[in-house]
């Protein structure tokens, strides 16, 4: 979305989004999944506009269809407020080499402070800043939605113009939160970055956890649309929408 203070016509964009969704069908629930980059640079004024945009979306949905959407959102790298200070790949690699500490994580979480206000308003990431699990009942179908923060240790304005694939981090002890519960019929995982953006150790564990516990993976970041299926040697698979 990359909402910023120079954006115009947000109300019209909300109307177009609503028209793209066929709400004349008798849905049991109306859920909007946002795969990150709500803001352009993680600043407070950008989230004020995001509140306005989604407020318009909800109001028009209620007015035209009598349905209030539930909004689930994950952060992207544009949802981080770097306070206009650059962070290079070499700096991130230094943090990874020394081992992630609790202070490192607290510092990372703090960079999302204005995003958390927006996410918490939508009942997301209230208890954990890395993974949030939602359970939705659709008639006789029970759906688990895993929200993953894939943007920890993102770079910003790297002077070497280097991309940060292979740098991102997720706490290995948090991955049990995406475990598909026994009574779940269908599992959806949503995160902003594809798995290749994570550091090698994180990538292996995250990919295995997703493969074992996810039926549908929704990604952002790459700015190109594609749908594909990933299969393992033991027959496990999931569909990815990017």
List PLM regions with ranges.
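Short acidic, glycine-rich surface-loop motifs adjacent to enzyme active sites
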Residues: 181-197
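Conserved beta-sheet core of the metallophosphoesterase superfamily
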Residues: 196-242
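Short catalytic/ligand-binding loop motif for oxyanion handling, primarily in non-cytosolic enzymes
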Residues: 4, 40-43, 79-84, 153-156, ...
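Structural motif
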Residues: 30-31, 70, 143-145, 186-188, ...
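Active-site glycine-centered loops adjacent to acidic/histidine catalytic or metal-binding residues
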Residues: 36-37, 76, 148, 192, ...
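N-terminal active-site segment of His-dependent metallophosphoesterases
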Residues: 1-71, 81-82, 175-183
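Active-site-proximal beta-strand elements of phosphoester/diester hydrolases
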Residues: 1-3, 142-156, 188-192, 238-242
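Extended active-site neighborhood of metal-dependent phosphoesterases/phosphodiesterases
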Residues: 51-166
């Amino acid at each position: 979305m990359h909402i910023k203070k120079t954006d115009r016509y947000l109300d019209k964009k909300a109307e177009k989004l609503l028209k793209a969704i066929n709400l004349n069908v008798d849905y049991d629930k109306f859920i909007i999944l946002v795969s990150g980059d709500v803001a352009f640079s993680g600043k407070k004024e950008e989230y004020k506009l995001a509140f306005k945009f989604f407020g318009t979306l909800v109001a028009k949905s209620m007015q035209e269809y009598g349905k209030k959407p539930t909004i689930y959102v994950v952060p992207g790298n544009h949802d981080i407020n770097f306070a206009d200070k650059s962070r290079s790949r070499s700096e991130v690699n230094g943090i990874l080499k020394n081992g992630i500490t609790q202070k490192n994580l607290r510092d990372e979480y703090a960079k999302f402070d204005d995003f958390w206000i927006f996410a918490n308003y939508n009942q997301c990431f209230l208890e954990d800043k890395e993974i949030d699990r939602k359970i939705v009942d659709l008639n006789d179908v029970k759906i688990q939605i895993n929200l993953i923060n894939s943007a920890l240790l993102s770079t910003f304005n790297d002077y070497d113009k280097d991309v940060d694939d292979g740098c991102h981090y997720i706490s290995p002890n948090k991955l049990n939160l995406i475990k598909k519960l026994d009574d779940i019929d269908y599992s959806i995982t949503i995160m902003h970055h594809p798995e290749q953006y994570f550091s090698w150790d994180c990538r292996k564990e995250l990919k295995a956890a997703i493969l074992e516990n996810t039926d549908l993976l929704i990604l952002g970041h790459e700015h190109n649309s594609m749908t594909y299926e990933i299969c393992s040697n033991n027959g496990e698979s999931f569909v990815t929408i990017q």
